[in-house]
Structure formats: C-alpha cells, structure tokens
Amino acid sequence: MDKKNDHKNNLIPQPASSFASSQERPTPMMEQYIEIKAVHHDSLLFYRMGDFYELFFNDAIEAAQALGITLTARGKHLGQDIPMCGVPVHAADDYLQKLIACGYRVAVCEQTEDPAEAKKRGSKSVVRRDVVRLVTPGTITEEKLLDPTRANYLMTLSRIKTSDGEDFALSWIDISTGIFRVTESRQEKLLADIMRVDPQEIIVADAFFHDKSHKSLFNVLDHIVSPQPACLFDTLTAERDICTYFKLSTLEGVADYSRCELSAIVAAIRYIEKTQITHRPPLMQPERQNESATLFIDAATRLSLELIRTTSGQRDGSLLKAIDRTVTGGGSRLLIDRLIAPLTTPSAIDTRLDSIDFFLRNPSLAEAIKLVLKGGPDMPRAVSRLALGRGGPRDMATIQRGFEIIRELNQILNNELLPQEISDVQQIFSNLPVSLHCHLEQALADDLPLLKRDGGFIRSNYHKELDEMRALRDESRRVIAELQAQYAQETDIKTLKIKHNNILGYFIEITSTQASGLTNNPQAKARFIHRQTMANAMRFTTTELADLESRIAHAANHALTLELEIFDTLVQEIIEQVEFIRKAAEALAILDVSVALAYLAEEQGYCRPKIDHSLTFHITAGRHPVVEQALRKQAAEPFVANDCDLSVQENQQYAAIWLLTGPNMGGKSTFLRQNALIAIMAQMGSFVPATSAHIGVVDRLFSRVGASDDLARGRSTFMMEMVETATILNHASHHSLVILDEIGRGTSTFDGLSIAWAAVEYLHEVNHCRAILATHFHEMTALTEKLDRLHNVTMKVKNWDGDVVFLHEVTPGAADRSYGVQVAKLAGLPPAVITRATDVLHQLEQGEMAGKGHKLIDDLPLFSLKATSSLNEEKNKHDALHEALKNIHPDELSPKQALEAIYHLKQLEKNNGL
C-alpha cells in the first residue's frame, strides 16, 4: 500500500546530530521537521505552518506530482535547495482524498501551542508540533473522503502456526460507523473471506507478508496490504488490551475467542490507537461471524457474477446497481452487506421476506416511510467524527435530524400490525432519548457553521452568560462607529476611519496629506499615538480605543470559549447515547432496505421465493435482473424468461444436473448467470426475477463463467480454468450450486473433451450437487444415457432463409450443431470468408478428422484461385453499387429521376446478389 521514495539520497533529510559544525546545521524549524519525519518515515508528513500544511524533501516531490501542485524550495540542506510544496488547511481534505487514492499514508502534524506561548521561551523558540493522527485508507472518517454508500473497512489478518499447520482469523472495522467483526478462516477460503468483506486496507504481520508460501495471496491483494511489526499481533496482553479499550473487567461472558481471533482483534485495536493517537473511536464489541450462517461464494465467483462491481471495476452493470433502490447511505451499505453475505437459515431469510411482503401489501405506508427517509442523515459517521475530535456543529445537527426522523417514523409505524423485523425496528425507535433530543433542539442554532472554531452555533437565549458576551461583542460595532464620528469631528478630518486587522487590532487611519494635523499639534500628538506609516496613509491609536479593543476582544474570546464548552458537553451527552444511535441507525437501514426491495419487486414484477432445507431448485420463468433492465432501457426486445428445475426427481436421492448445449450468442451464459443470481437474491432476503421460485438453501455457490487470464501470476486462461474447476470439485457438497461454462475450452479438442467428461462424472457421482453445465462438446450429450440425474437441455434456434434466429429459449434435448458460421456472419465477416467457411465445414462433416489430415489439406487448399476470383467478383459487385451511389446528386434530381435512381439501385442489388 505504501508508496516508496525512489529519489536521490541527498533529498532525504539528515538528523541534526550528523552535522560536523553548527554552520551546517539546519534551522530550528527544519530540525524539528527532521525529528518528526524520522519517526514517520513511511508516511507523507503534513507539517502545519500557519494556514498551510507544508511538505519537504522527497515528500514534497511526490506530493507535488500526485496532487498537481507547484513544487518550490525553502532554505538549503547539505548545500542544496530543500524541495517544498504546501496545501491550505481549509482544503486539506480534498488533497488527502487524492493522496489516499494514490496509496499514500499521511501523518498530520499540528501546532500544539500558540506562537505567543513559544515566544515566552525565547524569541527563537519554535512552536511545538506533533503528529495528531495518521491518515490511511482504512482509518478515514471525514465526510469528503468517504463514499456514503459503501463501508470503509480496515481488516487485520492474523496467522498463528500450530503443530497441525496454520490457523487464520480476520477482523474488520469501519471506524466511521463503529462496526467490528471477527471470524476464523482457513487457507483455502482466505481469499474468498477477504473478498467478501472488500476492505480498503489490510494489516498483516511482517513475517506473514514475506512468507513465500503466501506470496500468491498478497500478489492478488497488492497495494491494499500494509505490513506491520509482529508486536501488533502479539497475544500475550491481548485480553487485557481489549478489555481496556472496551472498559471491561473480563472477556468472560462476552465471547470465547480463539487465540487467532484475539490476535486479529487486538491488532485492529492497536493499529487504531497507533493511527488515531489522541482519540478513540466508539467501536462496538467484536461480533463473531458464524461461517455456516452465510452462503460461501469464492473470489472467482464473485468476480464473474459481478455482484458489486463489473469485471472492469464499474458499479454500472453490476447486480447491486440493478437492485439498489435505497435512499440513505446506511441503507445502501446494508444492502451491500446482505448481497455479499446471503443467509443460509430459511427462518432468517423468511423474516426479511416478510418485511418486503408487508410493504408490498401496504404501498401507502411504504411511500410515507420513503419520503421521511429520503436523504436521511448518517448518524454513526457523525458520532464517530465527534468522538474523534473531528466533528463540527453540523455533525451535531445530523444527530438532531436523525432523532427527528426516528420520532416521525415511530409515529407512522405505531398501531400497525407489523412483521417481526419491522416490529423490532419500531421497538428501537420507541427508546429515543428524549432529553438529548430536546437538548440538541434547544441548543443548536438554525444556521450552523462548518467548523466549531467559527462560533455562532449555539442558539440565542440558551445560555445567559453567552448572550451577555455576544451583546457586548456586537454592541461594540455601534460604539466603534460613534467613536469614529467623535474623532472625525474632533480632528476635523471627515475621512478618518477606525479599522481593524489581525496585526494591529483596532486603529485610526487617515491619509498622509492629513497627518500633519495630528503629528504637528502637541495636544493632538499626545492624544493620538502613532502606530504605523504607510505609503499613502498613517495609522494611530488612543488610550480610549485600546481599552475598548481589550473589552471587545475579551467578550469575543469569552463568547467563543463558552460555545466550545457547551459543544464539548453536548458531544459527551451524544457519546453516552452511542449504543442507541448505532442501533437506531441500523434500524433505519433495515427499514430503508425493506421498503427499497418492495419497490424493486413491484417495479420489476419479482416474486417471493420459497426457501427451505430441501435440495429443490425450481425456477419458473426466471430472468436475468441486470440484462432485463438493460434491454428495457434500450427499448429492445423483451427479455425471454426460462424455467430451470434441478430438483430431486422421483426415485432419486440427489438433485439434477443440466447439460446445456447450443450456439454462441444463443444465451447460454446469460441463463447460467441468471440462476446463480436468483439464488443469491433469494438467500439475501429479496424477491426474485421469476414467476415462481422454490430453492433449497445453497451452502456454497460456484460459478465459472467467462474467460479470465491471470498474467500477473503467470497463469493462462486454461490454467485459471483448471484451478477454479479444482476448487469446485474439491469443495462442492450436495447442497451446493455449480455453474460451469465451457469447461475444457482452453486446450486441444480431445484434452478438453476428456477433462469436461471426467468433471461431469465427478460432479454427478461424488459431489452430488445441483449444477448447470454449458458445453460446446456435443459428444458429451451421450453421457445422459450413463448418468441418470444428468439431463440435456439446449438453446432453441430457428433457421429463416438460410439465416439463424436465436430464440433464447431453453428446451429439453441437445443441439444439432454449433451454428458458429452463422454467428460469424452476424458479426460481419466478409461474405467470401463465410462462403469459404461453409465449404470447409461441409467437407469436415463428411468424414472423420483422424487419419485424413493430408487428404483434407489437398481437398481444402487455402483460398484457391477460385476462391481468390470469388473475392474479386465480390469486390467488383460492391464497387458497382458504390459507383452508382456516387453518381447520384439528390439536390439535382426531379421526383421522377429520384424514383428511377432507386429502381436502378434495386436492380444492381438483385443482379449482384447482394
């Protein structure tokens, strides 16, 4: 994940102790920078200087290039200019976002004392600075840096060697919402578990990262992995450190974590303490994820089915994009959680389906809830920012607005006969902390600043002393105006002004030509004290003005101090209610997802699936959810629905396997994918694109659809296919669903046929799983005579005037041929090539290939003279038509001539057989 410096060594700052003489030593400020940078050598250092974060040396070179900002220089080091660039503090979030996206870590170094305090230690004293946080991809909380629709997970991956091999555990945290989960894993499913969570950053121990036996894993994960010292994962004090963080006396009764799980949990906590430094985000206690409670989907299957993103990394075209009708960030994140981890317990799935059913039967209620939820605030992320000291008044308003929505929704749901899941939601809403809600309503002003340091966020009449200080501060404007009028009259200088800046404070300003009246008159000179001479003006003050300034400054400063004290009190009250806020936010997300899936079902005509523990897989008129919507948007032909029945047949113990044949472009891959997606949608607790669906819970879903090279690891398409097929054959159970497309296509015909043949037999005889297998080997259709649970189905086609029409219908039986030449014709290959291919195919089909290679070469010479002549004839026909079109000038033709030209073109077409 970390970017490596690759510049010359003379751009790397040397510590002050390495210099031979004091003349060579860097300035005190640069000494301080070098000391801090040495501690955070693996991060870009944002070094606060006034209103800017400055970067020096290699950091400046890399940041300037990554951010597209100007690279300049400041001072010298070892006789060379020190590269420097900077970004404004007020715009730092935008620059941080770019750096994090480029894979950098950033150490944010702030001034920890006021410059005035530093001067008390001596005129050359440097303002104290220290790093207050490390910004990494997995630990960001700023609203600008986060995608509201996506969780931002930091994952820790722990490994403990045992006498039997290796134990693995994963923990993952979203510090922006407080989610904290942990699970054990195994080497063969490690990548699948990681891909399911989809973390932004992964923490591993150095030794684990550099272990050659796991090199392939970390090659896949690439830049999101951050190796850390082994001490981060040490379990010696793990229980104590975990208890300290969560303020527990013991972990007994909380969870019986394994040693490997403890290692993953404590590593996450220590890394958060390391990066957040002075603050602790309010995290929920680690929740253990039960492996058997969710549908296992391996990494290759997730990629090929394009659940969250397409293979090119885009959200458009994914299943998520097709089904997401949520209106809140929390709802969108929950929908993703459900989509990446479908359930395997029918009762839990039915609980979710009951909620959707309820809103389908109560559309007016669903509409009312949707209107209230729309654009609802993200309370957990606001709480996290407040707890970490990065929140502002608007984050408090987010909590207040969230409470208002909860109160309104509680009233809407009250007195309704609710399904279990929605009833639980309503119960949570009924526990709204009314006192905190009222406190926030009374305290917060209507128009809030972004930053608390700007003040003005506490409502008038909320705090008596604050109102008094504000009155004095605001009244001063009138007093200053009166004093200005008095001085103007007293000096007879009508243009005299009282102004203010941060250097001089309040001062009297007159033009240089008018200054003699104050500087030459002894009485005026004693009263008006000279402060500054400008090119065209002179500035003065008076004892009276200085006293007034002191009173105003005190009032303004004291007013801000009081506001900040009130802010801190409110933050503490909010943090005390963090458990309710977290549960309420989850309840809001559940409500959003339930209503959204009801809208989806109504809009797309989806049905409620029947889910049980059987081996049934019976889909009536199933459709592909993504392709169907894409066709509708294009106003194209409607999607052709197809049945799929892999259920246990009479007198059979296990479910069926379908062997699918048919032409390319006939819809085989779409049919394969749609059934896998229907299974996922059903088990995530959604209605599905079908007329009816009965699905026995799938424990593992395997999908091998589409070619994928793995060039980075030196694997070809065929090698990848074999690795993925091996995973399927080694791990599929009789409750699994397997989707395989064109197994064995990446090698010779006989090798491929042999592998496909053996794989089908193994799935039938050993795995006993439900499966749909597409193949271009027509010889395999004979297997149905040998394997009683294997059934031939094919994609229906129709011949029309020598052309093939794909009907996209799945029917019983086997394909009579491949229709490859017809597909080539549709793709636009030249007519001569199509004619030649048809001749070659005809001769090949007349006899067996084996033993007749030389005869075929003689019979089928490469584009013979006759063929070449045909090509020339074809070209001449097109040239004649092209010439006729060139000679037509539409603007010069009469209606009769235009009609004659059309007849001429039609005759050319007929004569040339075009």
Swiss-Prot record:
GO terms for molecular function: ATP binding; ATP-dependent DNA damage sensor activity; damaged DNA binding; mismatched DNA binding. Keywords: ATP-binding, DNA damage, DNA repair, DNA-binding, Nucleotide-binding. One of its GO terms (biological process) is mismatch repair. CDD domains: ABC_MutS1. ATP binds at residues 662-669. The keyword NAD does not apply. Residues 11-25 have a biased composition (Polar residues). Residues 1-25 are annotated as: Disordered. It holds the Pfam family MutS_II. One of its GO terms (cellular component) is cytosol. PROSITE patterns: DNA_MISMATCH_REPAIR_2. Belongs to the DNA mismatch repair MutS family. This protein is involved in the repair of mismatches in DNA. It is possible that it carries out the mismatch recognition step. This protein has a weak ATPase activity. This is DNA mismatch repair protein MutS. It comes from Bartonella tribocorum (strain CIP 105476 / IBS 506).
